[in-house]
Amino acid sequence: MKKTLAFVVIVALSITCALAQSWQKVTPANECTNRHENSLTAIGNKLVLVGGRGVKPVESFDIKTNTWTKHVETPLEMSHFQAINYKGEMWVIGAFTGGYPHEVPIPDVYIFNIEKNEWRKGPSIPEDRRRGAAGAFVYKNKIYIICGETDGHWDGTNAWFDEYDPKTDRWRRLADAPHIRDHVGASVVGDKLYLAGGRRSTAKIQQVLNLTEPAVDVYDFKTGQWSTLSEAQNLPTKRAGASSVVLGKKVLIMGGESDAQEESHANVEAFNTQTMQWEILPMLNKGRHGTGAVNVKGKVYTVAGSGNRGGGPELNSIEVFE
């Protein structure tokens, strides 16, 4: 009986702690550009907003001063990607350019230095591995891209996994993920990569939003092996174009779009890598897809995105989970 009561108390405390955190609207001193199919990363205390449909400026939000600063425009249209911070610079890799439904993979990596306010072209992506709507991340000073699509929203969803070593300027192909998916974000906790969400965009057969992938795939860097979690551990709310971010030992899947509803999803679900279970967190104030999320000193921020499935309305609002 005592053990049962103790368990109930622990669960109650966990729920109370989760509910104590909530999404707050941030009101900046000035506004940024409305955009979607963009990405977001953090450099120091700044949120760096980049890309989207059309050519747009890079913009950074200083958390301390609550102000936006406008930087130079992107060298070309950049959309559908997961920007990363590599040694204090922002890298754009696994992105699209051009219009729907035949967006074209950007063949090169582009790197933005916020201090110099300038772009430079980085390494070329191997020709037969170019795609957009891919996940990207850094692990032990190497850069990775995972899954994506080769022909815009038309066709070519894949499970490719590639590693780039900036030190040696070499690419390496790794084992394909168990499931093909695009419009996916990647998150790493410890030595494991977690993939949740995404879909198989296939406009050539009028199947763009509805072929969502519920399974969670995990890559163990120590063993070099993929695994798929049980069906009971599937993503609770199937969607694509969601943001993926790490908070402690949890992977948060935020927002997204699907054929289930017109409005973008406001759902925030966290996969606890210690209990190996999903937790339901408070919803966003405004559902959104086609953007990113970052963790800055234990607070999760998201900016911009699309308020409905598809291409609009474009947002410029900021929310923080604290």
Model-derived features: positions:
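Bacterial N-terminal signal peptides
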Residues: 6-16
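Positively charged n-region of N-terminal signal peptides that target proteins for export
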Residues: 1-4
